[in-house]
Regions:
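Conserved donor-binding/catalytic core segment of Leloir-type glycosyltransferases
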Residues: 2-6, 190-199
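Active-site proximal beta-strand in glycosyltransferases
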Residues: 3, 85, 102-119, 141
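N-terminal strand-loop element at the rim of the active site
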Residues: 5-66, 161
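Nucleotide-sugar donor phosphate/pyrophosphate-binding loop at the beta->alpha transition
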Residues: 67-71, 110, 117-137, 149-157, ...
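Glycine-rich phosphate-binding loop signature in dinucleotide/nucleotide-binding domains
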Residues: 78-84, 190
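Short His-centered aromatic/hydrophobic patch
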Residues: 88-96, 115
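A short, active-site helix/loop in glycosyltransferases that binds the activated sugar's phosphate group
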Residues: 137-176
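A short helix/loop element that forms part of the nucleotide-sugar donor recognition site in Leloir-type
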Residues: 175-190
Length: 199
């Protein structure tokens, strides 16, 4: 099976990059041929590219500039139409027509679009992007339900082809708890007026 994953860059200081690294390093790369289409890592950041390449991921490095990356993706897909899966990490309205471009150039690929963001306010342009994503993508992932709704539409989480990729905070496990707060403060001798940040 041949997979194309599209992301921004491979610096290790971001959740998206860490998600990509963790996913690919835990994938059986003897069964799956993975091409990772990414922008060049900023020079001031450590890159996870060496670890991915050592594991067998083929990295296609392109400029970390949105317009240049779209042009490079178009050129790549014109000559590489044999992907079974395209996993597209997206965070913008421009990703919607890019999803359409992928569908036209690789009509047999299963397209997975993956949102990691929630940036209100919602605009009419975003509403149009929702429709375009829903027209061309096969599956929808969000790092949380809110991220899925923001990029793909208000009710996307009601569709059977939407899933949460668990790299967000699980609010059923991590939430304010008055009893736990009181117990921790008592255990460490921290008064109610003192500020406490937990990491």
């Amino acid at each position: 099976m041949k997979i194309l994953m599209i992301s921004n860059h491979l610096g290790v200081q971001s959740g998206v990059q860490r998600y990509v690294q963790n996913l690919l390093l835990n994938l059986d790369l003897t069964r799956y041929q993975v091409d990772l289409f990414v922008g060049l890592c900023p020079p001031d950041q450590a890159s996870c590219a060496p670890a991915l390449e050592a594991a067998g991921v083929h990295i296609i490095a392109v400029p970390d500039n949105k317009k240049a990356r779209i042009r490079a993706l178009y050129q790549h897909l014109k000559t590489h139409k044999d992907y079974d899966i395209i996993h597209y990490h997206t965070a913008s309205k421009i990703g919607a027509p890019v999803c359409g471009m992928m569908r036209v150039l690789c009509p047999h690929a299963k397209i997975i679009v993956h949102s990691h963001i929630v940036y209100p306010p919602m605009t009419l342009t975003w509403r149009a992007a929702h429709l375009v994503y829903q027209l061309f993508a096969d599956y929808f992932l969000g790092c949380g339900v809110a991220a899925g709704r923001f990029v793909f539409g208000d009710h996307i989480d009601r569709r059977p082809n939407f899933s949460v990729a668990c790299n967000a905070v699980d609010q059923t496990r991590f939430y304010p708890n008055a009893a736990a707060r009181t117990a921790i403060r008592a255990q460490y001798g921290i008064t109610e007026t003192e500020r406490l940040a937990g990491f």
